[in-house]
Design a protein with these regions (language model features):
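Residues within the helices of the helix-turn-helix
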Residues: 5-8
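Short helix-start
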Residues: 32-57
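Helix-turn-helix/winged-helix DNA-binding modules
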Residues: 2-3, 42
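Well-ordered beta-strand positions in beta-sheet-rich domains
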Residues: 42, 154-156
């Protein structure tokens, strides 16, 4: 007999929060509830299915070290100080420094995570491009090492990232419609990087600056330390498998359609990863 869990029990079993659970269940289709009579009543879940999902999630999740973070932060700062402008999707609003650096670091951490994932799980070495360019560079893997040595990839691979709660890989129309910006395959990652990473990095200096101030005692024991991060390699899809839409659950795209794939439909089994690696 299967062990049946309520939604609350399922959330506790997976050790996640309700918003992430709902996104993965309702929007992403990463796991299913048991059938309900006339689609009514409380959601219930088979524990064994959730366990399979959790185990699959764990083997695709990579630990990122301080050295990985430092490499990505260096790239982000180089981008910032060369005057590069990162705008919100489809708007002219510039993002403030903290958000801009955070987004760049997350993007690079995703690339490092894919590199480590390929090496750890499939013994495949790939090289990333951490150079700074004037134009957008669509391909994130610039070389592959095989029995003949180092060579250029046979296909273009774009590595995209978003927050852990994200249920969709989302790409702007120009990224797909313009041939010079399009990749053959997209890998989607969900790095779990705290928004206060810069505070964690500079904790000692911040304490030095504010200790003795009026409110310091109220938060001095709450300031977090820097810790290793994780990044889930959520899956991949070919460019032709993306869907052109004007909205996804909870979000209308204001400035034209986007190309998307919900994470539950991404390729993520070991066999599918081996298939992708054989194409590189």
């Amino acid at each position: 007999m299967p062990n049946i869990l309520t939604k609350k029990q399922a959330i506790e079993f997976l050790g996640t929060d309700e918003k992430i659970f709902d996104n993965y269940f309702k929007n992403a289709g990463e796991f299913k509830a048991l059938p309900r009579q006339n689609n009514r009543g409380f959601f219930k879940f088979d524990q064994s299915e959730l366990e399979r999902w959790r185990d699959d999630y764990k083997w695709r999740t990579i630990e990122l070290t301080f050295e990985d973070y430092a490499k990505c932060l260096d790239f982000a700062l180089a981008q910032h100080f060369r005057g590069y402008v990162l705008s919100d999707w489809g708007t002219a609003r510039q993002r403030e420094f903290g958000q801009k650096i955070t987004n760049w670091v997350k993007g690079q951490l995703a690339e490092v995570a894919v590199q480590k994932f390929f090496k750890n799980e499939f013994n495949k070495e790939v090289e990333l491009d951490f150079k700074i360019y004037d134009d957008i560079v669509p391909q994130d893997i610039i070389s592959v090492t095989d029995e003949t040595g180092k060579r250029a990839p046979r296909i273009g691979v774009g590595i995209k990232s978003s927050k852990p709660k994200s249920a969709y890989l989302v790409l702007g129309e120009n990224e797909i419609s313009l041939e010079g910006r399009r990749s053959d395959v997209y890998i989607f990652c969900r790095p779990d990087m705290p928004d206060d990473h810069l505070l964690r990095l500079t904790k000692e200096k911040v304490i030095e600056a504010v200790q003795g101030q009026q409110h310091f005692p109220s938060y001095q024991d709450k300031m977090p330390d820097f810790q290793n991060m994780t990044c889930e390699i959520a899956g991949w899809c070919a460019v032709g498998e993306l869907e052109r839409v004007t909205s996804i659950p909870g979000q209308e795209f204001e400035n034209g359609p986007r190309f998307v794939k919900k994470t539950g439909d991404l390729h993520r089994s070991r066999e599918k990863w081996e298939e992708l690696i054989s194409q590189l």
